[in-house]
Amino acid sequence: MNYYNDFEIASGERISILFAERNIYTFSEAAQYIKSLPYKRNKNKKDIACVLIDNYGTCSTKHALLKQLAIENEQPEFKLMMGIYKMHACNTPHIAPMLHAYKLEYIPEAHNYLRYNNLILEFTSKKSTPADFIPDLLEESEILPEQVTDFKICYHRDYISQWQKQENIPYSIEELWEIREKCIKSLSEQVLGA
């Protein structure tokens, strides 16, 4: 049972048409389709349709696409959120060796998801749920679909820089970003079974 407005896709705009071409006619069908696609970084994140073109995506591209679908179909109650949470060995076991190697308890990670009223909607992968990150959520803000690229990266890097200073982390922002990239690569490889 869905606890959100499962609207029919009725718009004649680009994203709605791309879903209709795949015989997907409601938001819940679109969300389940997107959730079933593999987790992998897209080739051209600036194209909002990249998930449908590549047949895979990340939390950013998948949720931005669903938000754009909601916009096209005049459903403003669906909000695209960017949260910063503590990514650590308990909520992301695949990165435990990397964090241990660098003697880090956690690293702040930016995550995108949708909110419908007070309900958190998570469509990153088949197994992902809000419980994966909500207990460790540090902050969140609403963003626009086009902000999942440059804006998200800048915001995330600024957050890590502040965290590094406040916690006296013995790495530069560049080193921390590289550690984070290694964690994400490790996670992607585990998710893809590589």
Task: Give the ranges of each region predicted by the language model.
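Secondary-structure boundary elements
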Residues: 1-57
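Generic structural hydrophobic/aromatic packing signal, biased to beta-strands
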Residues: 30, 34, 70, 78-80, ...
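Proline- and acidic/polar-enriched loop/turn elements at helix boundaries
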Residues: 46, 82-83
